[in-house]
Amino acid sequence: MVSYAADSHIRYGELYWRPAADWPEGSMVTLYDRGTARPLGEIPQVPHTYQVIGFMNEHQVAIGETTFDGRPELQDSTGIVDYGSLMFLALQRAGTAREAIKVIADLVEQFGYASTGESFSIGDPNEVWIMEIIG
């Protein structure tokens, strides 16, 4: 089982819901920094996205994370995909935990990573993965 907790009285006081959707060709997704809501850039949208409630999608893929920071000199100043965007994009695009790992890796490779160190716990009914990213 994978879950997510953030022990903060001022952050994460809401439950996120994103419905499943079909997107027209050429649609873009605007990415925002999870901590500051600052726009980071845009990436192409996929043709279909899955429903997400909290940090689990309609296929029971769930993602949690642990921030461990990273060395500042390793951070990618040109990256536009932060850890929060990676979590939601993976949930919207992946039907299994294994697919979520690939979605995250592909997005970071294509668009760069805009956060420090994160450890993602990604599970589905059949398997669980741990993925660490330092940026």
Predicted regions and their residues:
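Cysteine-dependent hydrolase recognition
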Residues: 91, 97, 115
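A contiguous strand-loop segment
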Residues: 1-82, 103-135
